[in-house]
Protein backbone atom coordinates (compact mmCIF):
# COMPACT_ATOMS: atom_id res chain seq x y z
CA UNK A 1 0.00 0.00 0.00
CA UNK A 2 1.08 3.56 -0.68
CA UNK A 3 -0.14 7.07 0.13
CA UNK A 4 -1.77 8.66 -2.92
CA UNK A 5 0.15 11.89 -2.40
CA UNK A 6 3.41 9.91 -2.69
CA UNK A 7 2.20 8.22 -5.87
CA UNK A 8 1.37 11.65 -7.32
CA UNK A 9 5.01 12.70 -6.81
CA UNK A 10 6.09 10.15 -9.45
CA UNK A 11 3.98 11.89 -12.12
CA UNK A 12 4.86 14.76 -14.44
CA UNK A 13 2.78 17.95 -13.98
CA UNK A 14 -0.30 16.32 -12.42
CA UNK A 15 -3.42 18.36 -11.66
CA UNK A 16 -5.01 17.09 -8.46
CA UNK A 17 -8.63 17.69 -7.55
CA UNK A 18 -9.85 16.40 -4.19
CA UNK A 19 -8.14 14.86 -1.20
CA UNK A 20 -4.85 13.12 -2.04
CA UNK A 21 -4.22 12.19 1.59
CA UNK A 22 -5.70 8.73 1.14
CA UNK A 23 -4.22 5.26 1.27
CA UNK A 24 -4.07 3.26 -1.95
CA UNK A 25 -4.41 -0.48 -1.45
CA UNK A 26 -4.33 -1.52 -5.10
CA UNK A 27 -3.80 -0.08 -8.56
CA UNK A 28 -5.43 -1.21 -11.82
CA UNK A 29 -6.39 -0.13 -15.33
CA UNK A 30 -9.21 -2.71 -15.50
CA UNK A 31 -12.50 -1.46 -14.04
CA UNK A 32 -13.56 -5.08 -13.51
CA UNK A 33 -10.61 -5.63 -11.17
CA UNK A 34 -11.25 -2.58 -8.97
CA UNK A 35 -11.72 -3.22 -5.26
CA UNK A 36 -12.03 -1.02 -2.19
CA UNK A 37 -9.11 1.37 -1.87
CA UNK A 38 -8.00 1.15 -5.51
CA UNK A 39 -6.48 3.77 -7.78
CA UNK A 40 -8.10 3.35 -11.20
CA UNK A 41 -6.09 4.37 -14.26
CA UNK A 42 -8.24 5.31 -17.27
CA UNK A 43 -6.44 4.31 -20.47
CA UNK A 44 -7.63 5.38 -23.90
CA UNK A 45 -7.02 2.17 -25.83
CA UNK A 46 -7.41 1.16 -29.46
CA UNK A 47 -10.91 -0.24 -28.96
CA UNK A 48 -11.94 0.74 -25.41
CA UNK A 49 -11.63 4.05 -23.57
CA UNK A 50 -11.19 3.58 -19.83
CA UNK A 51 -12.58 7.06 -19.20
CA UNK A 52 -16.02 5.61 -19.95
CA UNK A 53 -15.62 3.29 -16.96
CA UNK A 54 -14.46 5.78 -14.34
CA UNK A 55 -17.77 5.87 -12.47
CA UNK A 56 -18.08 2.09 -12.64
CA UNK A 57 -14.65 1.92 -10.98
CA UNK A 58 -15.77 4.37 -8.29
CA UNK A 59 -18.87 2.29 -7.60
CA UNK A 60 -16.59 -0.75 -7.19
CA UNK A 61 -14.52 1.00 -4.51
CA UNK A 62 -11.92 3.18 -6.25
CA UNK A 63 -10.84 6.08 -4.00
CA UNK A 64 -8.93 7.90 -6.75
CA UNK A 65 -8.79 7.99 -10.54
CA UNK A 66 -6.00 8.90 -12.93
CA UNK A 67 -7.32 10.47 -16.15
CA UNK A 68 -6.23 12.45 -19.20
CA UNK A 69 -9.69 13.74 -20.12
CA UNK A 70 -12.36 15.72 -18.31
CA UNK A 71 -14.73 13.31 -16.58
CA UNK A 72 -17.77 13.81 -14.38
CA UNK A 73 -17.21 11.78 -11.24
CA UNK A 74 -19.64 10.70 -8.57
CA UNK A 75 -18.79 11.02 -4.88
CA UNK A 76 -15.87 12.53 -3.01
CA UNK A 77 -13.10 11.14 -5.19
CA UNK A 78 -9.60 12.40 -5.85
CA UNK A 79 -9.10 13.00 -9.57
CA UNK A 80 -5.55 13.22 -10.91
CA UNK A 81 -5.31 14.62 -14.43
CA UNK A 82 -2.20 14.12 -16.57
CA UNK A 83 -1.39 14.59 -20.23
CA UNK A 84 -1.05 10.86 -20.94
CA UNK A 85 -2.27 8.19 -18.52
CA UNK A 86 -0.23 5.48 -20.22
CA UNK A 87 3.01 7.37 -19.60
CA UNK A 88 1.89 8.13 -16.05
CA UNK A 89 1.13 4.46 -15.46
CA UNK A 90 4.67 3.52 -16.47
CA UNK A 91 5.97 5.82 -13.73
CA UNK A 92 3.61 5.20 -10.84
CA UNK A 93 2.92 1.46 -11.06
CA UNK A 94 6.53 0.26 -10.54
CA UNK A 95 6.74 2.69 -7.59
CA UNK A 96 3.53 1.29 -6.08
CA UNK A 97 4.99 -2.23 -6.18
CA UNK A 98 8.39 -1.08 -4.80
CA UNK A 99 10.30 -1.59 -8.06
CA UNK A 100 10.41 -5.39 -7.66
CA UNK A 101 12.71 -5.96 -10.64
CA UNK A 102 15.49 -4.25 -8.70
CA UNK A 103 15.40 -7.07 -6.14
CA UNK A 104 16.05 -9.86 -8.65
CA UNK A 105 18.43 -10.66 -11.48
CA UNK A 106 16.37 -9.90 -14.58
CA UNK A 107 17.14 -11.80 -17.79
CA UNK A 108 15.18 -10.63 -20.84
CA UNK A 109 14.96 -12.83 -23.93
CA UNK A 110 13.75 -11.31 -27.19
CA UNK A 111 13.61 -12.41 -30.83
CA UNK A 112 11.11 -13.76 -33.33
CA UNK A 113 11.66 -17.42 -32.51
CA UNK A 114 13.27 -19.41 -29.71
CA UNK A 115 12.31 -17.20 -26.77
CA UNK A 116 10.32 -19.85 -24.90
CA UNK A 117 12.80 -22.71 -25.17
CA UNK A 118 15.75 -20.44 -24.40
CA UNK A 119 13.98 -19.04 -21.32
CA UNK A 120 13.19 -22.52 -20.01
CA UNK A 121 16.75 -23.71 -20.60
CA UNK A 122 18.06 -20.74 -18.60
CA UNK A 123 15.58 -21.53 -15.82
CA UNK A 124 16.66 -25.18 -15.80
CA UNK A 125 20.35 -24.31 -15.47
CA UNK A 126 19.77 -21.68 -12.78
CA UNK A 127 17.52 -24.03 -10.82
CA UNK A 128 20.21 -26.73 -10.95
CA UNK A 129 22.50 -24.23 -9.18
CA UNK A 130 20.01 -23.88 -6.34
CA UNK A 131 18.40 -20.60 -7.38
CA UNK A 132 14.67 -19.98 -7.09
CA UNK A 133 13.64 -18.89 -10.57
CA UNK A 134 10.63 -17.12 -12.02
CA UNK A 135 9.62 -17.32 -15.68
CA UNK A 136 7.27 -15.05 -17.61
CA UNK A 137 6.53 -16.18 -21.15
CA UNK A 138 4.31 -17.53 -23.88
CA UNK A 139 3.42 -20.83 -22.21
CA UNK A 140 2.91 -19.70 -18.62
CA UNK A 141 4.18 -17.81 -15.60
CA UNK A 142 6.29 -19.85 -13.20
CA UNK A 143 7.18 -18.86 -9.65
CA UNK A 144 9.53 -21.55 -8.43
CA UNK A 145 7.81 -24.79 -9.42
CA UNK A 146 4.28 -23.34 -9.47
CA UNK A 147 2.76 -22.56 -12.86
CA UNK A 148 0.10 -19.93 -13.61
CA UNK A 149 -1.75 -19.22 -16.89
CA UNK A 150 -0.82 -16.20 -19.02
CA UNK A 151 -2.66 -14.32 -21.79
CA UNK A 152 0.09 -12.17 -23.35
CA UNK A 153 3.73 -13.14 -23.84
CA UNK A 154 4.58 -10.02 -21.84
CA UNK A 155 1.79 -8.87 -19.46
CA UNK A 156 0.70 -5.22 -19.27
CA UNK A 157 2.45 -2.83 -16.88
CA UNK A 158 0.15 -3.41 -13.90
CA UNK A 159 0.02 -7.20 -14.22
CA UNK A 160 3.76 -7.43 -14.84
CA UNK A 161 4.70 -5.38 -11.80
CA UNK A 162 2.24 -7.36 -9.67
CA UNK A 163 3.78 -10.64 -10.87
CA UNK A 164 7.31 -9.41 -10.22
CA UNK A 165 6.27 -8.22 -6.76
CA UNK A 166 4.81 -11.67 -6.03
CA UNK A 167 8.07 -13.28 -7.16
CA UNK A 168 10.07 -11.13 -4.76
CA UNK A 169 7.65 -11.93 -1.93
CA UNK A 170 8.14 -15.66 -2.62
CA UNK A 171 11.94 -15.48 -2.62
CA UNK A 172 12.69 -15.60 -6.35
CA UNK A 173 16.31 -14.62 -7.05
CA UNK A 174 16.26 -14.71 -10.87
CA UNK A 175 13.46 -13.84 -13.29
CA UNK A 176 13.74 -15.04 -16.88
CA UNK A 177 11.34 -13.16 -19.10
CA UNK A 178 10.29 -13.37 -22.72
CA UNK A 179 10.14 -9.77 -23.89
CA UNK A 180 7.91 -9.28 -26.93
CA UNK A 181 8.27 -6.50 -29.48
CA UNK A 182 4.75 -5.35 -28.58
CA UNK A 183 5.77 -4.97 -24.93
CA UNK A 184 8.88 -2.99 -25.86
CA UNK A 185 7.01 -0.74 -28.29
CA UNK A 186 4.12 -0.11 -25.87
CA UNK A 187 6.27 0.41 -22.79
CA UNK A 188 4.89 -2.58 -20.87
CA UNK A 189 8.33 -3.25 -19.41
CA UNK A 190 8.86 0.30 -18.17
CA UNK A 191 10.23 0.21 -14.66
CA UNK A 192 12.02 -3.10 -15.28
CA UNK A 193 15.80 -2.87 -15.25
CA UNK A 194 17.30 -5.88 -17.02
CA UNK A 195 20.67 -7.33 -16.11
CA UNK A 196 21.01 -9.48 -19.22
CA UNK A 197 19.45 -9.10 -22.66
CA UNK A 198 19.35 -12.08 -25.04
CA UNK A 199 18.75 -11.78 -28.81
CA UNK A 200 17.73 -15.03 -30.54
CA UNK A 201 16.93 -13.97 -34.13
CA UNK A 202 14.77 -11.65 -36.19
CA UNK A 203 12.52 -12.67 -39.07
CA UNK A 204 9.17 -11.50 -40.41
CA UNK A 205 6.36 -11.34 -37.85
CA UNK A 206 3.95 -8.82 -36.29
CA UNK A 207 4.04 -6.44 -39.28
CA UNK A 208 0.30 -5.95 -38.76
CA UNK A 209 1.33 -4.07 -35.60
CA UNK A 210 4.76 -2.60 -36.39
CA UNK A 211 3.93 -1.80 -40.08
CA UNK A 212 7.59 -1.98 -41.19
CA UNK A 213 10.44 -4.35 -40.47
CA UNK A 214 12.61 -1.43 -39.33
CA UNK A 215 10.03 -0.58 -36.67
CA UNK A 216 10.02 -4.23 -35.60
CA UNK A 217 13.83 -4.24 -35.32
CA UNK A 218 13.81 -0.91 -33.45
CA UNK A 219 11.37 -2.33 -30.89
CA UNK A 220 13.60 -5.35 -30.25
CA UNK A 221 16.67 -3.12 -29.90
CA UNK A 222 15.08 -1.17 -27.04
CA UNK A 223 15.94 -4.05 -24.70
CA UNK A 224 19.64 -3.75 -25.58
CA UNK A 225 19.64 0.02 -25.32
CA UNK A 226 18.18 -0.39 -21.83
CA UNK A 227 20.90 -2.67 -20.44
CA UNK A 228 23.52 -0.02 -21.19
CA UNK A 229 21.42 3.07 -20.41
CA UNK A 230 22.84 5.64 -17.96
CA UNK A 231 21.56 6.02 -14.38
CA UNK A 232 21.19 2.27 -13.86
CA UNK A 233 20.85 1.03 -10.28
CA UNK A 234 22.30 -2.47 -10.89
CA UNK A 235 25.70 -3.71 -12.03
CA UNK A 236 26.86 -6.84 -13.85
CA UNK A 237 25.03 -6.13 -17.12
CA UNK A 238 25.52 -8.03 -20.37
CA UNK A 239 24.10 -8.95 -23.77
CA UNK A 240 23.94 -12.32 -25.54
CA UNK A 241 23.57 -11.95 -29.31
CA UNK A 242 23.15 -14.43 -32.18
CA UNK A 243 25.84 -13.20 -34.56
CA UNK A 244 24.74 -15.63 -37.30
CA UNK A 245 21.49 -13.71 -37.63
CA UNK A 246 21.72 -10.99 -40.28
CA UNK A 247 20.50 -8.41 -37.75
CA UNK A 248 22.89 -9.43 -34.98
CA UNK A 249 25.36 -6.64 -35.85
CA UNK A 250 22.54 -4.07 -35.80
CA UNK A 251 21.64 -5.18 -32.27
CA UNK A 252 25.29 -5.01 -31.16
CA UNK A 253 25.39 -1.36 -32.24
CA UNK A 254 22.62 -0.56 -29.76
CA UNK A 255 24.43 -1.53 -26.57
CA UNK A 256 27.66 -0.74 -24.77
CA UNK A 257 27.19 -3.59 -22.29
CA UNK A 258 29.66 -6.53 -22.33
CA UNK A 259 28.64 -8.92 -25.13
CA UNK A 260 28.84 -12.65 -25.71
CA UNK A 261 28.11 -13.52 -29.34
CA UNK A 262 27.13 -17.05 -30.34
CA UNK A 263 27.34 -18.91 -33.62
CA UNK A 264 27.39 -22.28 -35.34
CA UNK A 265 29.58 -20.84 -38.11
CA UNK A 266 32.59 -20.11 -35.90
CA UNK A 267 31.93 -16.36 -35.82
CA UNK A 268 31.11 -15.95 -32.13
CA UNK A 269 32.84 -15.92 -28.78
CA UNK A 270 30.66 -18.96 -28.02
CA UNK A 271 30.48 -21.51 -30.85
CA UNK A 272 28.88 -24.89 -31.58
CA UNK A 273 30.24 -27.33 -34.15
CA UNK A 274 30.27 -31.03 -35.09
CA UNK A 275 26.50 -31.22 -34.62
CA UNK A 276 24.91 -34.69 -34.68
CA UNK A 277 21.14 -35.18 -34.49
CA UNK A 278 18.59 -37.98 -34.09
CA UNK A 279 14.79 -37.56 -33.99
CA UNK A 280 14.95 -37.25 -30.19
CA UNK A 281 18.38 -35.92 -29.30
CA UNK A 282 21.44 -33.97 -30.37
CA UNK A 283 25.13 -33.93 -29.57
CA UNK A 284 27.70 -31.28 -30.43
CA UNK A 285 30.84 -29.52 -29.29
CA UNK A 286 30.70 -26.07 -27.70
CA UNK A 287 33.84 -23.94 -27.78
CA UNK A 288 34.29 -21.06 -25.34
CA UNK A 289 37.31 -19.24 -23.94
CA UNK A 290 39.77 -21.65 -25.53
CA UNK A 291 38.09 -24.81 -24.24
CA UNK A 292 35.83 -27.42 -25.88
CA UNK A 293 32.85 -29.04 -24.18
CA UNK A 294 30.69 -31.89 -25.44
CA UNK A 295 27.00 -31.08 -25.02
CA UNK A 296 24.39 -33.87 -25.19
CA UNK A 297 20.73 -32.81 -25.24
CA UNK A 298 17.34 -34.53 -25.15
CA UNK A 299 16.18 -32.11 -27.86
CA UNK A 300 16.75 -32.08 -31.60
CA UNK A 301 16.99 -29.49 -34.34
CA UNK A 302 19.55 -26.89 -35.35
CA UNK A 303 17.26 -24.21 -33.94
CA UNK A 304 17.64 -25.84 -30.53
CA UNK A 305 21.42 -25.69 -30.85
CA UNK A 306 21.02 -21.92 -31.20
CA UNK A 307 18.61 -21.84 -28.24
CA UNK A 308 21.12 -23.77 -26.15
CA UNK A 309 23.95 -21.40 -27.04
CA UNK A 310 21.80 -18.42 -26.02
CA UNK A 311 21.01 -20.08 -22.68
CA UNK A 312 24.65 -20.99 -22.11
CA UNK A 313 25.71 -17.39 -22.76
CA UNK A 314 23.15 -16.00 -20.31
CA UNK A 315 24.22 -18.42 -17.60
CA UNK A 316 27.92 -17.74 -18.15
CA UNK A 317 27.12 -14.09 -17.41
CA UNK A 318 25.50 -15.27 -14.18
CA UNK A 319 28.84 -16.74 -13.14
CA UNK A 320 27.95 -20.40 -13.71
CA UNK A 321 30.79 -22.56 -14.98
CA UNK A 322 30.59 -24.29 -18.34
CA UNK A 323 30.98 -27.63 -16.55
CA UNK A 324 27.90 -26.97 -14.38
CA UNK A 325 25.93 -25.68 -17.37
CA UNK A 326 26.76 -28.81 -19.36
CA UNK A 327 25.73 -31.04 -16.46
CA UNK A 328 22.36 -29.28 -16.13
CA UNK A 329 21.60 -29.38 -19.86
CA UNK A 330 21.82 -33.18 -19.89
CA UNK A 331 18.57 -33.33 -17.90
CA UNK A 332 16.66 -30.66 -19.85
CA UNK A 333 13.47 -31.84 -21.59
CA UNK A 334 11.71 -30.14 -24.50
CA UNK A 335 9.18 -27.41 -23.73
CA UNK A 336 5.53 -28.40 -24.38
CA UNK A 337 4.55 -27.73 -27.97
CA UNK A 338 8.12 -27.17 -29.17
CA UNK A 339 8.97 -30.01 -31.58
CA UNK A 340 7.00 -32.24 -29.23
CA UNK A 341 6.85 -35.90 -30.25
CA UNK A 342 3.42 -37.54 -29.91
CA UNK A 343 3.87 -41.26 -29.43
CA UNK A 344 1.15 -43.91 -29.33
CA UNK A 345 3.23 -46.79 -30.70
CA UNK A 346 2.76 -45.78 -34.36
CA UNK A 347 5.43 -46.63 -36.99
CA UNK A 348 5.86 -42.98 -38.00
CA UNK A 349 6.68 -39.75 -36.17
CA UNK A 350 4.09 -37.14 -35.20
CA UNK A 351 5.45 -33.77 -34.13
CA UNK A 352 3.52 -30.78 -32.76
CA UNK A 353 5.23 -27.40 -32.90
CA UNK A 354 4.34 -23.77 -32.21
CA UNK A 355 5.97 -22.56 -35.47
CA UNK A 356 3.75 -19.77 -36.78
CA UNK A 357 6.22 -17.58 -38.66
CA UNK A 358 8.00 -18.22 -41.98
CA UNK A 359 11.36 -18.70 -40.27
CA UNK A 360 9.89 -20.83 -37.49
CA UNK A 361 8.19 -23.11 -40.00
CA UNK A 362 11.31 -23.42 -42.13
CA UNK A 363 13.42 -24.25 -39.05
CA UNK A 364 11.29 -27.19 -38.01
CA UNK A 365 10.95 -28.41 -41.60
CA UNK A 366 14.73 -28.32 -41.99
CA UNK A 367 15.01 -30.38 -38.82
CA UNK A 368 12.43 -32.84 -40.14
CA UNK A 369 14.35 -33.11 -43.41
CA UNK A 370 17.61 -33.80 -41.57
CA UNK A 371 16.11 -36.78 -39.73
CA UNK A 372 13.50 -38.01 -42.24
CA UNK A 373 13.33 -41.64 -43.31
CA UNK A 374 10.38 -41.30 -45.66
CA UNK A 375 7.89 -38.48 -46.42
CA UNK A 376 7.32 -35.18 -44.62
CA UNK A 377 3.62 -34.48 -44.13
CA UNK A 378 2.78 -30.92 -43.06
CA UNK A 379 -0.45 -29.71 -41.44
CA UNK A 380 -0.59 -25.95 -40.91
CA UNK A 381 -2.57 -22.73 -41.31
CA UNK A 382 -2.17 -19.01 -40.67
CA UNK A 383 -3.90 -16.85 -38.08
CA UNK A 384 -6.62 -14.34 -38.86
CA UNK A 385 -6.35 -10.62 -38.03
CA UNK A 386 -2.57 -10.93 -38.21
CA UNK A 387 0.15 -10.14 -40.76
CA UNK A 388 -1.41 -11.42 -44.00
CA UNK A 389 1.78 -10.99 -46.04
CA UNK A 390 3.37 -14.04 -44.42
CA UNK A 391 0.58 -16.39 -45.57
CA UNK A 392 1.87 -17.10 -49.11
CA UNK A 393 5.45 -17.13 -47.79
CA UNK A 394 4.60 -19.87 -45.29
CA UNK A 395 2.64 -21.73 -47.95
CA UNK A 396 5.65 -21.71 -50.25
CA UNK A 397 7.98 -22.91 -47.47
CA UNK A 398 5.63 -25.76 -46.54
CA UNK A 399 5.46 -26.89 -50.17
CA UNK A 400 9.22 -26.64 -50.70
CA UNK A 401 9.93 -29.05 -47.84
CA UNK A 402 6.77 -31.10 -47.51
CA UNK A 403 5.88 -34.12 -49.61
CA UNK A 404 2.24 -33.79 -48.59
CA UNK A 405 0.81 -30.48 -47.35
CA UNK A 406 -2.56 -30.03 -45.65
CA UNK A 407 -3.62 -26.38 -45.51
CA UNK A 408 -6.11 -25.76 -42.71
CA UNK A 409 -7.37 -23.23 -40.13
CA UNK A 410 -5.41 -21.73 -37.24
CA UNK A 411 -7.24 -19.13 -35.12
CA UNK A 412 -9.15 -17.42 -37.96
CA UNK A 413 -10.57 -14.87 -35.50
CA UNK A 414 -12.85 -12.41 -37.35
CA UNK A 415 -11.61 -13.38 -40.82
CA UNK A 416 -13.15 -15.92 -43.17
CA UNK A 417 -11.05 -19.10 -42.75
CA UNK A 418 -11.66 -20.02 -46.39
CA UNK A 419 -10.10 -16.74 -47.55
CA UNK A 420 -7.08 -17.24 -45.26
CA UNK A 421 -6.56 -20.69 -46.76
CA UNK A 422 -6.76 -19.19 -50.27
CA UNK A 423 -4.04 -16.68 -49.34
CA UNK A 424 -1.82 -19.54 -48.13
CA UNK A 425 -2.65 -21.62 -51.20
CA UNK A 426 -1.06 -19.02 -53.50
CA UNK A 427 2.35 -19.76 -51.98
CA UNK A 428 1.78 -23.51 -51.82
CA UNK A 429 1.21 -23.64 -55.58
CA UNK A 430 4.41 -21.65 -56.18
CA UNK A 431 6.55 -23.92 -54.00
CA UNK A 432 5.10 -27.32 -54.90
CA UNK A 433 7.76 -29.77 -56.05
CA UNK A 434 7.40 -32.56 -58.59
CA UNK A 435 5.91 -35.60 -56.90
CA UNK A 436 4.51 -33.67 -53.94
CA UNK A 437 0.90 -32.59 -53.50
CA UNK A 438 -1.35 -30.59 -51.23
CA UNK A 439 -4.91 -30.66 -50.00
CA UNK A 440 -7.15 -28.02 -48.43
CA UNK A 441 -9.10 -29.19 -45.37
CA UNK A 442 -10.39 -26.11 -43.57
CA UNK A 443 -11.50 -28.04 -40.47
CA UNK A 444 -8.30 -28.46 -38.43
CA UNK A 445 -9.47 -31.63 -36.67
CA UNK A 446 -10.25 -33.29 -40.01
CA UNK A 447 -6.91 -32.17 -41.45
CA UNK A 448 -5.00 -33.75 -38.55
CA UNK A 449 -7.05 -36.94 -38.78
CA UNK A 450 -6.52 -37.17 -42.53
CA UNK A 451 -2.75 -36.61 -42.27
CA UNK A 452 -2.32 -39.28 -39.60
CA UNK A 453 -4.66 -41.76 -41.29
CA UNK A 454 -2.63 -41.52 -44.51
CA UNK A 455 0.83 -41.61 -42.92
CA UNK A 456 3.13 -44.52 -43.77
CA UNK A 457 5.99 -46.11 -41.82
CA UNK A 458 8.96 -43.76 -41.61
CA UNK A 459 6.93 -40.63 -42.36
CA UNK A 460 7.07 -37.48 -40.23
CA UNK A 461 3.72 -35.79 -39.66
CA UNK A 462 4.41 -32.20 -38.65
CA UNK A 463 1.47 -30.29 -37.14
CA UNK A 464 2.52 -26.64 -36.96
CA UNK A 465 1.14 -23.39 -35.59
CA UNK A 466 -0.42 -24.05 -32.19
CA UNK A 467 2.10 -25.98 -30.15
CA UNK A 468 1.13 -25.66 -26.48
CA UNK A 469 -2.07 -23.70 -27.18
CA UNK A 470 -5.31 -25.43 -26.23
CA UNK A 471 -7.81 -23.23 -28.04
CA UNK A 472 -9.06 -22.15 -31.44
CA UNK A 473 -10.24 -18.53 -31.80
CA UNK A 474 -13.25 -18.26 -34.09
CA UNK A 475 -15.28 -15.24 -35.18
CA UNK A 476 -17.74 -15.27 -32.29
CA UNK A 477 -16.19 -17.62 -29.73
CA UNK A 478 -13.11 -19.43 -28.51
CA UNK A 479 -13.29 -23.22 -28.34
CA UNK A 480 -11.05 -25.81 -26.71
CA UNK A 481 -8.65 -27.27 -29.26
CA UNK A 482 -5.29 -28.91 -28.61
CA UNK A 483 -3.23 -30.29 -31.51
CA UNK A 484 -1.60 -32.81 -29.17
CA UNK A 485 -4.95 -34.16 -28.01
CA UNK A 486 -6.24 -34.28 -31.58
CA UNK A 487 -3.13 -36.13 -32.75
CA UNK A 488 -3.39 -38.72 -29.98
CA UNK A 489 -7.09 -39.25 -30.69
CA UNK A 490 -6.37 -39.72 -34.39
CA UNK A 491 -3.52 -42.15 -33.66
CA UNK A 492 -5.82 -44.29 -31.52
CA UNK A 493 -8.21 -44.63 -34.47
CA UNK A 494 -5.69 -46.12 -36.89
PLM ranges: what are they?
Residues 1-91, 95, 268, 294-296, ...:
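N-terminal leader/targeting and accessory segments in enzymes
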Residues 67-70, 179, 201, 243, ...:
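Short secondary-structure boundary segments
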Residues 1-15, 36-39, 313-323, 327-337, ...:
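ATP-dependent carboxylate-amine ligase
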Residues 63-69, 238-243, 379-380, 403-410:
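Short internal beta-strands
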Residues 72-75, 196-350, 373, 427-428, ...:
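Acidic, Mg2+-coordinating active-site environments of NTP-dependent enzymes
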Residues 48-52, 186, 208-215, 387-390, ...:
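Glycine/threonine-rich flexible loop motifs
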Residues 75-83, 148-151, 256-261:
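Active-site regions of enzymes building and remodeling cell-envelope glycoconjugates
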Residues 89-241, 247-255, 309, 371-372:
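Phosphate-binding loop of NTP-binding sites
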